Amino acid sequence: MPSKPNAASRLVFLAFLLVISAAAANDDAAARRTMEQFAGFPASDDGEGPSSDFHVDSEGLQRQIDELASFSDSPAPSVTRVLYTDKDVQARRYIKGIMNQLGLVVREDAVGNIFGRWEGSEPGLGAVATGSHVDAIPFSGKFDGVVGVLGALEAISLLKRSAFLPKRSLEVIMFTSEEPTRFGISCLGSRLMAGIEELAQSLRKVVDNQNVSFLDAAESAGYKLNLEDLHSVFLKTDKYSAFIELHIEQGPILEKEGIPIGIVTAIAAPASLKVDFEGNGGHAGAVLMPARNDAGLAAAELALAVEKHVLESGSIDTVGTVDDEAAATTSDEGVGSINEMGLDID
C-alpha cells in the first residue's frame, strides 16, 4: 500500500510505464515502437532523447497527500470531504494550483470534473488520461482516490523533469463525486462524462438528506448549471485513446503477501438494495415476547442470512445503514429499514 514513500514511488512510476509500454508485453522491439509512437521521437541507447534517470519526488508527494488531507470535516487522521462542501471546494482549489504550477492547461466542466492537460506534439490524436477523485466518505483515510490524482500529477512532473516530449496529449482528471455520500449516486462525474442521460435527468430533482438539491449544492460550490449544462459534460467519441488509474489496494491481500503492485483484471460491481420492514409497535414492558412482531429483529435476521450466503459463495455484502423509526428503548420496533450493498465480479 502507498502509505510508505518508496511504495508510492513504484506505483507512480508504474502508471506511466504502463502507458508507454501498453502494447509491448515482453517484446523489446514492440516496447520501442510503442515508445516512439507515444513520445514522437526514436527510442535509442545513445543517450539522446529523454533522460532515463527517473526519480520520483516521494517526499514531495507525501507532503501533498498530507496537505490535501488537512481539508477535512473530521479530525486527523481521518478524512471527511463531501461533494460541494467548503472542504471539497478547498481541495479542488489545491489540485488546480498544482496543475497550474506544472504548466498544465486547466479547465473544469459544468459539474466540476477538473482536467489538467499537457499538450502533445500532435494534439489532434486522442489523449492518454489518468486520474481519480479526491472526495472522501466520512471518516475515511487520506489515500483513497487522492493517490490517483496526486500520483498522476507527480508522474507528469517526473516526465517533464526528464525532458519527455509526448506525441499524444496527457490529461490528469479529477472526477467529481466518485463517492455516493451526499446524493446516493456513485461515480457521478465520470458517468456524466460517459453520457448517461438517465443520470442527467435525475439530477434535476435529487436532494441530499438535508433536502438540498443537487443544483443548489453545485451552485453553492460555484457551479451554477441547468440541464443543458449537464449535457455539455458528455464526452465526444475518441476523445481519449487510453485511460489508466493508480489506486490503493483498499484491502489487506497485497500488503500481507508483500507484493508492492497489483494489476486489476476484474472489479466487484456494486448492487444496492433498501429493504423496509413493518412490524407491530408496542410498549417494551407490556407486549410479551410471543406477541411481538419486531421489525428490527427481522432486519437483523436478513442481514445474518445474507452474511451466511456470501461466506459460502465467495461474494461480498455490506449492511451500510440501519434505521429505526421508534429509536427508543421503551418501544419495540414497528418500522425499520436497512441498506445493503452486494459486490461480485460475476
Language-model regions: role of each:
Residues 94, 146-154, 297-301:
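Short amphipathic alpha-helical face segments that pack within enzyme cores
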Residues 20-77:
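N-terminal hydrophobic or amphipathic helices/low-complexity stretches enriched
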